[in-house]
Regions:
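Terminal low-complexity tails and localization/encapsulation signals of metabolic enzymes
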Residues: 1-54, 90, 94, 128, ...
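Glycine-rich loop-to-alpha-helix module at the N-terminal edge of alpha/beta enzyme cores
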Residues: 49-154
């Protein structure tokens, strides 16, 4: 791909083949971890070959231990960490701006199309909708996550 973006780690057009598969990792205790136990039931929709190395994670104890080690009280509370919501809003805005670049939009469109055989414009529509969501959410959307909602129902 011309002018690759720094975060790109796989080429959905010329990569992700049986000879050069895409590799999926588990995130455990802040580290990306691979495993020898790989799923064999996910095949390339274009030719039926195995093109992804996806961990067949059946032992969840590492994830549970990782969660138990994390401090959770106040971490996501907007009353304790208002700067976190500002930062998350900035992340959404920057992601949306990046997705507006034609080469990034094309990359994600081809990436979706590679794992889900759809027409180019269908996959591009998914990228555009996600970008628009991030644009909208980057404003007050993140701040409103800490707000309570009460909606009247039709029950008695």
């Amino acid at each position: 791909m011309p002018d690759p973006i720094k975060f790109i780690s796989i080429d959905p057009i010329n990569g992700m083949t049986q000879k050069k598969p895409g590799i999926v990792c588990n995130l455990i205790n802040g580290e990306w971890v691979t495993t020898d136990n790989i799923r064999k039931d996910i095949v390339d929709p274009m030719n039926g070959e195995h093109f992804l190395q996806i961990p067949d994670t059946t032992d969840h104890s590492n994830f549970i231990n990782d969660i138990n080690l994390q401090k959770s009280f106040g971490t996501h509370n907007p009353l304790y960490k208002p700067e976190r919501y500002l930062m998350l809003g900035e992340v959404c805005a920057k992601a949306a701006a990046l997705m507006a670049k034609p080469e990034v939009e094309h990359y994600f469109t081809k990436l979706i199309q590679r794992v889900m055989p759809k027409e180019y414009n269908q996959c591009r529509g998914e990228v555009i909708v996600t970008r628009i969501f991030l644009e909208n959410f980057s404003g007050d959307g993140v701040r409103f996550l800490g707000r309570g909602f009460s909606n009247p129902g039709d029950h008695q």
